[in-house]
């Protein structure tokens, strides 16, 4: 046989593999299919290692046989795995659907701020998540003055005086909140005598001014405001003690930061915002509220404000952004209501905050009739009789 005839036969065999006598082209095709469909395992179970008969001439009756063998194996494999994957898929779909429904009910309050870079709409959610973490890292313990020479009444007297000093110096709102935060954080780790309490107070305000204000009052001004009870050197020395005790960590979030965010989320007007500020400032004098986080105080103040002015409940959107449900805020709202009743009924001498918010500049918000309503009184009474 010539080499030309050999090549011709090879070409013919390549074009018509079934015409070859020993089925050489059929076996690899079946072996590959067997690897995918576990036909090898079935063949081993039946005791068949390979084809026992020579493949006969291809006919119409023989063509469907491989299909009949392969199809049941594929269907059986799918059917066997279907019960395992069906339940997780259904459960996952239900969870996704429920989560989507919750998200659809929550309004994206930052959606309209994309063209205003100063509002940081892309990062504002992350910023407030960080503030929530930060306030937990710098807590104030409940009843931290237990066993101290300084009492809660002395603390209230000092804070009431600091509110007046703050107004006298015309300082930023943040400065007052930071002053009280520094005061409480310092006193819980460094007890002082009654004689030095006022020194700690004015020094805390000096530190807060340096942190918040553009133009800080001089040390001599703080010495003068104490009627020269403390010298400039004493104030500077106490400043060093406070900063070392706090490890120079002054960036504790303030209730005012969270209130501004909560007001935006609620779409509250100026009256609701101002009333919430008044309610928050009353809490500065309350020793029994020092352990509440700033975000909790802000949320509770706005929740009570919108309840008194418009009778509005705490919405799902407010719950989502504040991370607090209304049920969680109710105990804090009772404390706030108690403080309102105390100043309205003249059961306390510390009235600097009420006088401050009775000015026309602050809408005379402390004089509105809603603060004398039965709702406020009922909340205050429920604090002692839950």
Curated annotation (Swiss-Prot):
Keyword set, alphabetical order: Cell cycle, Cell division, Cyclin, Mitosis
Signal peptide feature range: none
SUPFAM superfamilies: Cyclin-like
Keyword Cell division part of the UniProt annotation: yes
Region (Disordered): 45-64
Single GO BP term: cell division
MF-aspect GO terms: cyclin-dependent protein serine/threonine kinase regulator activity
Gene3D superfamilies assigned: Cyclin-like
Keyword Zinc set for record: no
The protein's assembly and partners: Interacts with the CDK1 protein kinase to form a serine/threonine kinase holoenzyme complex also known as maturation promoting factor (MPF). The cyclin subunit imparts substrate specificity to the complex.
Record family assignment: Belongs to the cyclin family. Cyclin AB subfamily.
Functional description taken from the UniProt entry: Essential for the control of the cell cycle at the G2/M (mitosis) transition.
Protein name (database record): G2/mitotic-specific cyclin-B2
């Amino acid at each position: 046989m010539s080499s030309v005839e050999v090549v011709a036969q090879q070409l013919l065999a390549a074009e018509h593999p079934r015409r070859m006598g020993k089925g050489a082209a059929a076996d690899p095709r079946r072996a590959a299919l067997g690897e995918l469909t576990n036909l090898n395992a079935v063949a081993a179970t039946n005791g068949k290692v390979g084809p026992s008969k020579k493949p006969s001439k291809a006919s119409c009756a023989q063509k469907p046989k491989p299909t009949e063998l392969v199809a049941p194996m594929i269907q059986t494999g799918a059917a066997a795995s279907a019960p395992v994957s069906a339940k997780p898929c259904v459960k996952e779909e239900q969870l996704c659907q429920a989560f989507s429904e919750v998200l659809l009910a929550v309004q994206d309050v930052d959606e309209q701020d994309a063209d205003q870079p100063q509002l940081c709409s892309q990062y504002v959610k992350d910023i407030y998540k960080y503030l929530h973490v930060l306030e937990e890292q710098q807590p104030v313990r409940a009843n931290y003055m237990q066993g101290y020479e300084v009492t809660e009444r002395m603390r209230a007297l000092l804070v009431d005086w600091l509110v007046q000093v703050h107004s006298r110096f015309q300082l930023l709102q943040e400065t007052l909140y930071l002053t009280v935060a520094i005061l409480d954080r310092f006193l819980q780790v460094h007890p002082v005598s009654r004689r030095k309490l006022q020194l700690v107070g004015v020094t805390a305000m000096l530190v807060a001014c340096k942190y918040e204000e553009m133009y800080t009052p001089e040390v001599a001004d703080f010495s003068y405001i104490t009627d020269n009870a403390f010298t400039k050197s004493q104030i500077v020395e106490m400043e060093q003690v406070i900063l070392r005790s706090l490890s120079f960590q002054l960036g504790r979030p303030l209730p005012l930061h969270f209130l501004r965010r909560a007001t935006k989320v609620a779409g509250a007007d100026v009256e609701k915002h101002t009333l919430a500020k008044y309610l928050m400032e009353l809490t500065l004098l309350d020793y029994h509220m020092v352990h509440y986080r700033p975000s909790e105080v802000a949320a509770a103040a706005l929740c009570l404000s919108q309840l008194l002015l418009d009778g509005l409940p705490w919405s799902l959107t407010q719950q989502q952004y504040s991370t607090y449900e209304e049920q969680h805020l109710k105990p804090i709202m009772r404390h706030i209501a108690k403080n309102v009743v105390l100043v309205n009924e003249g059961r306390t001498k510390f009235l600097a905050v009420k006088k401050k918010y009775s000015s026309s500049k602050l809408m005379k918000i402390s004089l509105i009739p809603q603060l004398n309503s039965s709702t406020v009184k009922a909340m205050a009474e429920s604090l002692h009789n839950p």
